[in-house]
Every structure is written in C-alpha cells, then in structure tokens.
Amino acid sequence: MKIKNAEFITSAAKTADYPAGNIPEVALAGRSNVGKSSLLNRLVNRKSLARISSTPGRTRLINFFLVNGLFRLVDLPGYGYAKVSARERQGWRRMVEEYLKTRENLKGVVLLVDSRHPPTVLDVQMYEWLKYQGIPAAVAATKADKISRSKRAQSLKVIREVLNLTAKEPLVFFSAETSEGREEMLEVIGRWVGLSGR
C-alpha cells in the first residue's frame, strides 16, 4: 500500500467527539513512550505529523489521522505511565476502552511493544483483552534498530511466548529510524481496511 497523503483530523476524549462517517480505522496501542507517534510518522513518511515527546504520557487524547483520504490511523493514549494520579490513569483507561469497545469503524489494533524487553503485564493484559473482544491485532516490536541481529530470534521468541502468539498472528520488527518493518505493517493495515495491494 502506497501512502500519498496524511493529515491530522481531530483529538477526542469522548464518543461524541469522534469523526463522523464510516471510514475504517486502525488504532495504535501500547505503553507510554513505546513509540506510537514515531511509528505513525514513519508509516506515513512524515516527520512530525504526530507530535513526538521524550516525556511519557504526553498523548492524553485520542488522535485521529486521515490517510490517503481512505482510512484513519488512531493514536491512543499510552498506558502504564506512573507519574500521573491514579484518577487520571483511570480516566485514560476508560477513554481507550470506550473507543475500542464501541467504535464500529475500528478494523484492527497494532499493539506496540519494546523489542529490547519482554512484554509487560500491561502489554499481556491489553493483547488478551483485544482477543477477548474479537478485535484483530498485530504486534509491532519497536526500536528494532537498537537490538543486535544476533539477539533478534530470541527477542521474537520471548515476545511470542509472553503474549501467547500463534504463528499466524502478525509480529513485525519495526524501526522508525530505518523504516524496517514499514512495508509489512502497511500490508497488515491494508488487509484490515480493505486496501491490500493498493
């Protein structure tokens, strides 16, 4: 799938603020600072479409981006950020759950995990929850440029084991720095939104 253009549409905290229409959507989920905004920018080949922060927890709303005028990428607030109040974390969780459970436009979720470390308990909970809800999911192992080739097989093995992935469930090494994994991830997204090969 070739990306010709991408634009920020809106930020939303509740259902009433979601974009109207039946354009298919793919959401990006993961821990704070795992690289969701960087992955989004690399997928659409724009350096600063989604704001990147070195401070975890900066994405506090659900951000919608229109791609090729045909589908939306949706950047969800990260989970697991400790330096906010329990009340605020609970609010983010409710916001994300409401989107994932009620959004009819949603066709799939890319769960980002850091390739350098085993998935966290929260990563496992999120992946199991997506499967329980019947939402198609793929895993992007981010920061792939920071892991040596010799350690990759072990990293993949650990991620598959911890998340209990089958061989058919997509797992892609991804680097926002080198573009590794970009085409594979776009192929997965293209299948979900009905644009495979376009």
UniProtKB/Swiss-Prot annotation:
Transmembrane segments: none annotated. It comes from the Bacteria. This is Probable GTP-binding protein EngB. The gene is engB. The keyword GTP-binding applies. Keywords: Cell cycle, Cell division, GTP-binding, Magnesium, Metal-binding, Nucleotide-binding, Septation. Necessary for normal cell division and for the maintenance of normal septation. InterPro entries: G_ENGB_dom, GTP-bd, GTP-bd_ribosome_bio_YsxC, P-loop_NTPase, Small_GTP-bd. Its cofactor is Mg(2+). The keyword Magnesium applies. GO terms for cellular component: cytosol. GO terms for molecular function: GTP binding; metal ion binding. Belongs to the TRAFAC class TrmE-Era-EngA-EngB-Septin-like GTPase superfamily. EngB GTPase family. GTP binds at residues 30-37, 57-61, 75-78, 142-145, 174-176. Mg(2+) binds at S37, T59. GO terms for biological process: division septum assembly. Residues 22-195 form the EngB-type G domain.
